[in-house]
Amino acid sequence: MSSAQNVKKSILAPVLDNNPIALQVLGVCSALAVTTKLETAFVMTLAVTFVTALSNFSVSLIRNHIPNSVRIIVQMAIIASLVIVVDQVLKAYLYDISKQLSVFVGLIITNCIVMGRAEAFAMKSAPVPSLIDGIGNGLGYGFVLITVGFFRELFGSGKLFGLEVLPLVSNGGWYQPNGLMLLAPSAFFLIGFLIWVIRILKPEQVEAKE
């Protein structure tokens, strides 16, 4: 397999074939919390992709110099440093979105996807493949966030990116927003529905019966 094919596989595989949320069921908590709007889902996608990619790259660079007994501490220190950078940039340039994301930016530090890729991939791989793996898993995470955020904002408020798409009753239109779509349980059911659709398209992901 050529290097270009390897790059393509590393980036695209986590979207459907090995999605960190839909297949591995990681990072679900933040997916429930930040998907009421497409805007916050998109920014969270960028934040997680940035942190996952650069933490993978950094961990891989020094992997041969990290004592096994403190490797998790080192990984968390690197991830925490990157999260602080992201948090400060959001507060400086996207303050309103930063307030909406609240503590969930800080909780990227303990996100299972970020920690999992650093431990399972970056500790065993070269820097560039680790960087690409981080980008791919960030995009896989973002695919679920943006898909769920699309439906929650559209049917919950009749808007996308804050712009009215469905004519609202309050403005003389026909659509009455469904407030249930803005509650966390709706995201839980939408993620479940998305997992169901993916496993229909990818039957090899269905767990074998015991």
Swiss-Prot record:
Chief location bin:
membrane
Q: Which domain of life is it from?
A: Bacteria
Q: Which residue ranges does UniProt annotate as crossing the membrane? A: 42-62, 72-92, 103-123, 131-151, 178-198
What keywords appear on the UniProt entry? Cell inner membrane, Cell membrane, Ion transport, Membrane, NAD, Sodium, Sodium transport, Translocase, Transmembrane, Transmembrane helix, Transport, Ubiquinone
* Known regulation of activity: This reaction is tightly coupled to the Na(+) pumping activity and specifically requires Na(+) for activity. Inhibited by korormicin and 2-N-heptyl-4-hydroxyquinoline N-oxide (HQNO).
Q: Name one GO biological process term.
A: sodium ion transport
**Subcellular locations according to the entry:** Cell inner membrane
Q: Which region is the signal sequence?
A: none
PANTHER family attached to this UniProt entry: ELECTRON TRANSPORT COMPLEX PROTEIN RNFE (PTHR30586), NA(+)-TRANSLOCATING NADH-QUINONE REDUCTASE SUBUNIT D (PTHR30586:SF1)
Return the similarity comment.
Answer: Belongs to the NqrDE/RnfAE family.
Task: Summarize subunit and interaction data from the UniProt record for this chain.
Answer: Composed of six subunits; NqrA, NqrB, NqrC, NqrD, NqrE and NqrF.
Q: What is this protein called?
A: Na(+)-translocating NADH-quinone reductase subunit D
Query: Which species?
Result: Vibrio alginolyticus
